[in-house]
Amino acid sequence: MKKLYKGFIMALSMFTILPTPYVEWDDDGVKNMMKFYPLIGLIIGVLWSIIYYLASILNASIILKSSIITIVPFIITGMLHLDGFMDVCDAILSRRSKEEKLRILKDSATGAFAVIPLVILFFLQFGGVYSILEKNSSLYTLILIPIISRSVVAYYLLSRATIKESTLGTYFKKGTNVYDKLIMIITLIITLIISVILLNIYGIILVLLMSLGIKLSVEKCRKEFGGISGDVAGFALVIGEVVGILILGIIP
């Protein structure tokens, strides 16, 4: 139990900016971190929904409310996944050789091919949130998105070969086993059931299209880089979540 607690605290401090008790980082904690990735998604989703509720009752324009709700998940995660999204976009859109793309992926410099997709991403996410607010959708639906995205991304991270140059991707997989992947599958099934209860048939569409968006993102990166990494996981997660927000914004 102590090892699981340590894994949870390590995961919470790694993937969010939320304050956590001090624990010493070691291999016992690392191998349990991924088990809690969907739970981290639940925590983010709950906080996101609370902000959605508070913003919705503000006497402010829908544009201001949408802006606040759009940036909340990125702030909670410390922009961690956005960094991966930008790095991957910069590498893929460079249209260089595989070796050069891998070099760009590790480069800390930010290029135009990273900034332009980021602007597009924010426009899409803002538009989806604006539509959700305009329809006065249930705040509970926002909780689903971070759970779905993290369950699917974690499954692929644990199931696919990592890029040799990826220290972070290898680090997250250290000591994991089939039970970790099983946790992701079970979590996704439970989330699917809850999605159907809240959204009827649209719940199935939400889970399937988010999962498809993540799968296509991962497979594209495997083709471009020869494997998956922490940056690739962040890229796929961001894609999956913007797909989810757009779906919630479109469905009646």
UniProtKB/Swiss-Prot annotation:
One of its GO terms (molecular function) is adenosylcobinamide-GDP ribazoletransferase activity. The chain crosses the membrane at residues 4-24, 38-58, 62-82, 113-133, 138-158, 188-208, 232-252. Its EC number is 2.7.8.26. GO terms for biological process: cobalamin biosynthetic process. Its cofactor is Mg(2+). Keywords: Cell membrane, Cobalamin biosynthesis, Magnesium, Membrane, Transferase, Transmembrane, Transmembrane helix. It is found in: Cell membrane. The keyword rRNA processing does not apply. It is a multi-pass membrane protein. It catalyses: alpha-ribazole + adenosylcob(III)inamide-GDP = adenosylcob(III)alamin + GMP + H(+); alpha-ribazole 5'-phosphate + adenosylcob(III)inamide-GDP = adenosylcob(III)alamin 5'-phosphate + GMP + H(+). Pathway: Cofactor biosynthesis; adenosylcobalamin biosynthesis; adenosylcobalamin from cob(II)yrinate a,c-diamide: step 7/7. Pfam families: CobS. InterPro entries: CobS (IPR003805). GO terms for cellular component: plasma membrane. Joins adenosylcobinamide-GDP and alpha-ribazole to generate adenosylcobalamin (Ado-cobalamin). Also synthesizes adenosylcobalamin 5'-phosphate from adenosylcobinamide-GDP and alpha-ribazole 5'-phosphate. HAMAP family: CobS. PANTHER family: ADENOSYLCOBINAMIDE-GDP RIBAZOLETRANSFERASE. Belongs to the CobS family. This is Adenosylcobinamide-GDP ribazoletransferase. The gene is cobS.
